[in-house]
């Protein structure tokens, strides 16, 4: 629940919905993921890069051709599409460990000709930081330095 003090942050918070798998992505610093309160292994560098790219666009689909070009610096090898699909499958297993076989993915979803991280199931630290920084700036401008300090500290926590 968002209190009145947190209302300014609400549009920028992206978090797990009730009953959904709670996935926290940390991209400020080394890329990490926490699922159900536990850190998880994100796999090899390209797989981590895929997750980072999708995390930068939470809730928005990213086309397969954009992913291929980004992951292989504009020159994807012939097996790139198969590798991308394997990375997606691996990340789905890691991000949704309790998902039944053949059940639709809810965190890393296929969308049209691409993939997206569902904003109802993923929280990204940079969004939380931006929300607190914005609320802190607004509090400072509004003449409330105590609240501003509290927001800035929360953003850095």
What kind of feature is each model-predicted range?
Residues 1-157:
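Intrinsically disordered, low-complexity protein-interaction/activation regions
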């Amino acid at each position: 629940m968002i209190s009145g003090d947190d209302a300014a942050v609400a549009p920028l918070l992206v978090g797990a919905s009730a009953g959904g798998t709670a996935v926290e992505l940390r991209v400020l610093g080394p890329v990490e993921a926490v699922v159900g309160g536990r850190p998880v292994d994100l796999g090899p560098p390209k797989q981590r890069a895929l997750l980072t790219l999708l995390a930068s666009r939470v809730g928005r689909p990213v086309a397969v051709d954009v992913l291929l070009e980004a992951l292989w610096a504009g020159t994807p090898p012939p097996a790139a599409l198969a590798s991308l699909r394997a990375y997606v499958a691996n990340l789905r297993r890691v991000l949704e460990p309790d998902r039944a076989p053949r059940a639709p993915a809810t965190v890393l979803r296929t969308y049209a000709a691409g993939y997206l991280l569902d904003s109802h199931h993923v929280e990204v630290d940079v969004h939380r930081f931006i929300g607190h920084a914005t609320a802190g700036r607004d509090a400072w401008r509004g003449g409330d330095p105590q609240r501003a300090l509290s927001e800035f500290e929360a953003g850095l926590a």
